[in-house]
Amino acid sequence: VGQLEKIAHKLRPELRLTANLSSEEVDLELIRLSASQLHVLEMLEQNKRLRVTGGPGSGKTLMAVETCRRELELNPTSKIGLICFNRFLGAFLADVVVREKMTQIQAGSFYSHCDGLIGNRGKVNESDSSYFVQRVREALQVAKKLSPDEKYDLLVVDEGQDFRDDGEMLELMDVLLKGGLARGRWRWFEDLDQVLSPEPTDQPTQKHEALLDLLDVAASARLENNWRNTEQIAQAVGKVMGLPVKPTARIFGPQVSTAPLVKDKEFAMLEALLSKVVLKDYQPKDIIILSMHGAGRESYAGKDTLAGLRIVSYDPSRAYEEGTIRVSTVFKFKGMESHAVILTDIDSLGSVRDRRKAYVGMSRAKYALYLIAKEGLSWGRG
């Protein structure tokens, strides 16, 4: 691979042998980087601190990992922190790092980094927000005692929008980086249209605002293209947020299909759609069912089977098990993707947060998208 990469770079600099992060096996394929991706890579070389924005499928995660690869090529002893909020995406990033033997990188979800500082306390009640707040505060106290040699030379944050509303999380990342966010080296990848947390009720502290300012005044770049979705899905995703459709890979697929969400018949409609439509075209392993509702409030909550398949929660660390159908929530599945997606429990698009959840859920589909939505909803923003 190394020799092929050198040949490709010599013949055509914009060609690069890059790990395809969409593949379960991290297949290596020769791809042409888009103009915006090349621009980002050039800016990474020119700036100590860079904020990169881009919509779903624009390659933010791909570029975050490529940033780490290039750093290690130039500085093999560099200590890198690769962080995201989402547990599933964090497990995926950690797996990529292990498989590529990039031992200088500490990759994973934010709370896995907390575990690295103060130890893993095992399974906890995920709804207990006070527990997680305390974990961050304990990790922050430990991090403040680290020597410079124990801190990161480079911090790479994926899905950075998930951290903006939490000053203590930002402070922990600030402390973990040599020179902090003000003088250290960092790359911050985000999409502000994917902020799913409720509007904060309290004003940010002065320290919180100062850390946000450091992100917002840094050099910035934009990833313009959508490489994940078909034209049909990209059109639907753009419509729900009132956004212009970004240039895509010009892959055309089936039209986005919508079924009615009827009160007290939500599960029956999901089962009918899956058994009579989706499973006729796609294998269960290629399908993910996402709910707009939180854990325990999904239309399939409390059910064991669906269309003759055993319902299991999606877990990227586990291989698909025959005879099952995988389910998750929009919030948990952020940063991930699937060949076919059924997005259900779409009962409201009245708030910006509702639309953002639909935007995130819909954009997880690479080729086929099915929606189960309350009739009469306005899909066009504004």
In which residue ranges do the predicted regions lie?
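Intrinsic-disorder-associated interaction segments
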Residues: 1-4, 129-133, 204, 263
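ATP-dependent helicase/translocase motor core
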Residues: 1-47
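Conserved helicase motor core of SF1/SF2 NTP-dependent helicases
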Residues: 30, 34-122, 142, 149-382
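Short glycine-rich substrate-engagement loop in P-loop NTPases that contacts/grips substrate
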Residues: 121-141
